[in-house]
Amino acid sequence: MTGTGEAQQMIADILRKIVAVYAPQKVILFGSYAYGKPNEDSDIDLLIIKDTDKRPIERWMEVKRLLRDRNRTVSVSPLVYTRQELEQRLAIQDYFIQEVLEKGEVLYG
């Protein structure tokens, strides 16, 4: 686990890279870093919303490659959905997605 200031800087750096290179519509931080309860096993959980024709695994790999940093002590766990996929998840009352959208911290968009 990193200190609060260090964690905030790391998240800001990650966000800058995602916005500059991946150009998402929205980025939401969720999980322990968003809810103020990170521990030594916590990762940075991000929901990234981007309209694209790429398959889910291709999107995930693209973001993971973009964020690869051997010096970072905290891993990043991105979820990449299109707006249509999010709407579908909400239509079936996906509790996880509902919670992320309600409790997560919008970092961009």
Role assignments for model-derived ranges:
Residues 1-26, 35-40, 50-109:
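Catalytic core of pol beta-like nucleotidyltransferases
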Residues 32:
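Conserved H-loop
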